[in-house]
Swiss-Prot record:
Mg(2+) 1 binds at residues 338, 377, 429. Residues 163-536 are annotated as: GTPase chaperone MeaI. It holds the Pfam family MeaB. GTP binds at residues 334-339, 380, 476-479, 1152, 1271. This is Fused isobutyryl-CoA mutase. Its cofactor is adenosylcob(III)alamin; Mg(2+). The lineage of its organism: Bacteria, Pseudomonadati, Pseudomonadota, Betaproteobacteria, Burkholderiales. GO terms for biological process: acyl-CoA metabolic process. Residues 193-240, 614-667 are annotated as: Disordered. SUPFAM superfamilies: Cobalamin (vitamin B12)-binding domain, Cobalamin (vitamin B12)-dependent enzymes, P-loop containing nucleoside triphosphate hydrolases. InterPro entries: Cbl-dep_enz_cat (IPR016176), Cobalamin-bd (IPR006158), Cobalamin-bd_sf (IPR036724), GTPase/Isobutyryl-CoA_mutase (IPR052040), IcmF (IPR033669), MeMalonylCoA_mutase_a/b_cat (IPR006099), MMCoA_mutase_a_cat (IPR006098), P-loop_NTPase (IPR027417). Residues 537-758 are annotated as: Linker. Keywords: Chaperone, Cobalamin, Cobalt, GTP-binding, Hydrolase, Isomerase, Magnesium, Metal-binding, Multifunctional enzyme, Nucleotide-binding.
Amino acid sequence: MTDLSTPQRAGSHKLPAGRRLRFVTAAALFDGHDASINIMRRILQASGVEVIHLGHNRSVDEVATAALHEDADGVAVSSYQGGHNEYFRYLVDLLRARGGERIKVFGGGGGVIVPEEIAGLERYGVEKIYSPQDGQRLGLQGMIDDMIARCAEGARAAAATGESQVGAWAAEFSEHGLPRFDSRDDVGVDRQGAVARNPSSEASRVAAAGRGDHLDRGVRAASTADTADTANTANTANTANTGSVADAADAADAADAADAADAASTASTASTASTASTASTAGIPDPASLVFRRLAQLISAFETAAIDVNTRDKLSALAEVTAIPLLGITGTGGAGKSSLTDELIRRFRLDYGDALTIAVLAIDPSRRKSGGALLGDRIRMNAIGDWGGGARVYMRSMATREASSEISDSLPDALMLCKAAGFDLIVVETSGIGQGNAAIVPFVDESLYVMTPEFGAASQLEKIDMLDFASFVAINKFDRKGARDALRDVAKQVQRNRADFAKSPEAMPVFGTIASRFNDDGVTALYRHVAEALRKHGLRSGGGRLAAPEDLRFSSGRNAIVPPARVRYLADIAQTIHAYRERADAQARLARERWQLIEARRMLVETGEAARSTVATSASPGASASSKANACTSTSSKANASPGANTTANSNASATSGTATPTDALNPTLSQLDTLITQRTASLGERERILLDTWPEIVAAYSGTEHIVRVRDREIRTALTVATLSGSEVRKVSLPKFVDHGEILRWLMLDNLPGYFPFTAGVFPFRRENEDPTRMFAGEGDPQRTNRRFKLLSEGMPAKRLSTAFDSVTLYGEEPHERPDIYGKVGNSGVSVATLDDMKTLYDGFDLCAPETSVSMTINGPAPTILAMFFNVAIDQQIARTTQRQGRPLTEDELAATRRTALENVRGTVQADILKEDQGQNTCIFSTEFSLKVMGDIQAYFVEHGVRNFYSVSISGYHIAEAGANPISQLAYTLANGFTYVEAYLARGMSIDDFAPNLSFFFSNGMDPEYTVLGRVARRIWAVAMRERYGANERSQKLKYHVQTSGRSLHAQEIDFNDIRTTLQALIAIYDNCNSLHTNAFDEAITTPTEESVRRAVAIQLIINREWGLAKNQNPNQGSFVIEELTDLVEEAVLAEFDRLTERGGVLGAMETGYQRGRIQDESMLYEHRKHDGSYPIVGVNTFLSAHPHEAPQPIALARSTDDEKQSQLQRLRAFQAQHRDAAPAALERLKRAVIDDENVFAVLMDVVRVCSLGQITHALFEVGGQYRRNM
């Protein structure tokens, strides 16, 4: 039997009795790369650690606040987006300033954080930055063990000194009282008073330190460019409190003279990057924040029984002085308790004007085997932060530990301490419960039970204890099937349980809610009743700021993104593809049998068995067919040129028509053959007969030296051969040599030539001779710098194919700011664009409406705003050109005509794929529902204004792959997302052929074999589904896609080897006829690529396209046995994944449960484990290692934005805002009203971007569209 009594922890580090290590994990601000940190938090949990995971895109303030309020031992942050020097320094500073000196900071960023920067950050105070070499040396578990050991040592040291201090605080507070919140006198009026009440307390000392120079110096140092990595010596030990040159000289004892000199330089110049307001707001803790920190430490002390009984009794008595209402929220696992809790807190804050102070105690289960716990409620909370008036919400995540129920044994003490602190409201959220659990009820005044509609038969409700005790019941996820019936059944059960038959079931406190929907009226109705009930238990009167909803108890209906009747669309598509393949096999069999019959008849005639026939075979329609077949098959070349389709073409006048001559009637064998031929011909489909009929013509067209197509009395000639130096003629398109009509037809139906349905080999018959598919990604610094890079990349190119990389600040819809964790990322890893003026500068000198100009913009969350800016630039360019040409101002009609012409001609792509952002890349900023609504608005605008040459979305698998997905998952999820957009746009009433041509795709090419056929499978599935299921035209059937070589396959070790990997990935992309291609620079593993490394990356493509011999042929993959086998294997695997997604409610239903994200994380972990144990060989990383690994690597030039560029952006932003300060407020109100009234938001954005900056627009949309809620 298995002993479950004690945890079997992986870590054997000795800790004080009852002590558990607690870690906060997160990805840095404006960083969606959370694959690594997710792996780390999983291993931490399995190693016995309690993990509070915050997810991606977390500011320093959010991480520091969580660490302090959760009383964490360590913080682990991944940073792959640059700005790490500022981020980690600022984090160390904030923790020190707010009383978290003992909290150890760990970090990692692959090769992005170079050794010199690692050394600098560790000298500054970061406990450890793990490098790729550390990972190689220690392995994943080894790195985790090292983190645990370092924190365990700190915990033991703290136990020797810190717990006695906490005990002293507890004793002091038990005598004099905790600094209580006095919300009745308006919290925040006297920010210093609460501290002054206990002048001898540690809180006073920390506040004094925060008001001094320490944090201001830290902000200044952290706000320099990344080149300040060696300036860290200015903060060694207790030196550098003023940031002066003298401080740097003092620091020379801890570092070399060069470091000190750099520190002095930094200290003298960095002040331009900080402001006094930054230091005061971020560094000086407000009184509530100080109370929260001490409260967190006291809760931990009570958990370890470090507080004596006498002190506890005094605190308990103190807690009972004031009646403080307690709300308990419990329910089944996965019911959405955390989201609903957050939405209720949001409504309390809004309704009371943010005057309430609220404590949230969230409990999650511990794992018995390891003792670890994933405390995952905080990641879901959007409404607990500082709204500008100081801290109002304290949250503590608790593990059940040895408790046998859904609550922690420490909950009573935690509630007592929260009461003693004087919160206005305390909310307790339990872990998931079963039918027989109701442990929360005795601890709270009012309880809320959260469930979903999927509870089974109505009889199951009789077994649920909480339906007896709950004050309120919320049926969350009310948009699911059967929700109305569930509401009725639960209400009746509650009525029976209460024996309250004087009221109707509809009057029972049972509510239907959709917590995932922003501003859901069902949640608001629930809030109204909960707040009213809590007022009876001491909740202060007030509120009334929220509009009262109609008298309802459930969420009102809205149009579903994908209508319920269409929710099985992916399974239907899979069935369509399978049916098409079955048809191809069946039709090929018929064609083969028919051809065999014709051949048999021909051979019978030729051998003389029908020699007695006196009628010449040429007079016989059947013989005519046979002779034609004979002519087609007499030589292999002739057989290839004519598959016997002539028989089909003449089937009504030949033997295949079933008409027999008198002579044939005398020959039973020939007559029977004719009958069989007629039957097979009749069974062939019309499309299939046409394919066989036209094949000889196609063969003839491709057999010469030129391919000639006539379009509107104009001939387009394409050379069909390329001569080699040896004199060989290499055909641009090679044809199969099949003779068997079945093989020909099967190949035509499943493969076919490039440019022919199902477009497996490519969507165009030939590549453009004068235009390589090169599209290089560029973006760095300010718009002027990137504009220069664009001109460099496109120099000498007949086509200007620009691909724009935005910095992470822009990617998250924000704008430049002096705050260090923002400032460090401005212009790094992309270009900073905050205003319409920035966009004009970025594309200055390029005619955006010229046929040879195409612009791709890689941006998603704020894509509608950025696209509106881009379209305005294109329109303004054309208006300026037309005005100059006319020599006068344009009339209103001329302006309108010019705008329409610009929109009709502008070419390019905006990524704007919000589904893959939720699943992989994580630059979602708005609620998913709102983002999808605005995507539909963009497409509707395209249809209305005739935008035909611009792609409204680039449905992207690249970022799914970069997050860790294998190639099959990348392809399956990407195609599934594409079909989801199709269903969503159809549901809005758009025609398939109006919007399908505006959809494009974006894939990664890696090293696995499946990448070789990614494009083939994608094109075939899309084409067949578009034609067979949606009835789309040929233009809509063509899937066009961009390829970027794998960033994940670039390694910081043996960095020069990266170009070899990129070359192979580019080769298979070109072989597969991708429509455009980006080749990564070899140094992207550690930095934004330099001009030289980008030139090398471009050269990879040019060498393949212009030098590589086999690339002269444009369908080299066709005819390969392994390519065909892989194509079928990958297609079948994708369709199987479609079925799995369907089982989970389609793409949106699967996203709700985190299915795609979970699969991606599992696949990422498999890759990481196999990379680290060497079973997945990577040359230069885990095999073929250098014989001299410790030699200093050749220094790589690090591309970083400069201080001048950052300051320039700040100045440009403020100048734009000052210029439009009068018009901006009205424009923002107009935008918000458009959202509320369900207008086309993008159409309004086209006007708003002319007077409002990106950050202003983003925050206005947050108010009415909601913020994205992170998933685990």
